[in-house]
Amino acid sequence: MKWYLWGAVVLLYSLFGSACSTEGRYDLSAYGLSPVENVDNAPAMARALEQIREKCEENQTIVVTLPKGRYEFYPDSAAERVYFISNHDQMNPKKVGLPFEGMKNMVFDGQGSELIFHGRMLPVSLLDSRNCVLKNFSIDFKHPQISQVKVVENDTVNGGITFEVAPWVHYEIRDSVFVAKGEGWELTPGSGIAFEGDTRHLVYNTSDIPVGVRGLIEVSPRLIKSPRWKDNRLVPGTVIAMRSWERPAPGVFLYHDVNTTLENIKVHYAEGMGLLAQMSENITLDGFSVCLKGADDPRYFTTQADATHFSACKGAIISKNGLYEGMMDDAINVHGTYLKVVRRVNDSTLVGRYMHPQSYGFEWGRVGDSVQFIHSSTMELIGARNRITEGRRSSRSGLRIR
């Protein structure tokens, strides 16, 4: 009798354990995604992720696989989202290629796929999700907004630089001005980053440099003379990534996530940061890289700004086994966001304001969070810590906090 009772207990435990650790597997090819050239996968991806999200359960692991291939995404039919992203231009709505939202215990495995984006898009977003892993894929754009050129001649006596435009750059000389063109966008570069042609290192003692994109003479297709461009540091063979200051979206965006792992992901280009994470807890980057495609990659650049950027995150931030190169700013940047006190309502209520045009609209703090006042001119602490009991938006860039 005792043996049978013990056997029944073991059987019930096994069944219960199995129910709590089941795994749901979803192959995205069954949802219409196709690695065929020029096929737009954006609408199929949006529909698939919405359907899969509805199947997420607390005690189930969801595994979403994308058969290895080259998948293209276009903005016209992509999911539209209003996202306010720290340290980026607040241009909305944004077109999102892979919108992961409200996911629980999910693993997305790209199985080595290349994700190619067109126009201006936010490639990957993960919002309001817990215990998720994104892995094994790369991100790139068909037509980057950065225009790469190579110095052919630098007349240091009379002035003027002649440069050659890289073969993949779409441009025109319009009224003697260089205009870069792409799918749904065009711009005139305002600055550049100079790289040594042979080493790909930054040219010594340079950061952002002025570029000569006006008063141009097109000597022949892709060979352009800029008579007014004077910079003795730019010797023949120097490669310059000419860019604007626009920063519409990162390659990967995390917001209000808990326990996120990004594994074996390569961001080859994004018009903003490679990764922007905000208001999230416990992030592990394992083999997450913002990098070129290898030693033979003709490009010298990757992202317009930081490789990785963490705004108002908490818990552990781990970055290992990654490579950050070719970006226009920091490899890793971790910070919070200050509000300026613009009005004292009463002894327990104030109005604070975001003071930077790339920092507003997103959540600043939640009820229960601690707040420390700081003297802006000296950075000295003022008084003891306080705790938020109520908060609401009072304007586009202002918050009323109690």
Predicted regions and their residues:
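Bacterial Sec-dependent N-terminal signal peptides
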Residues: M1-G24
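Extracellular/periplasmic carbohydrate-active domains that bind, remodel
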Residues: A19-R402
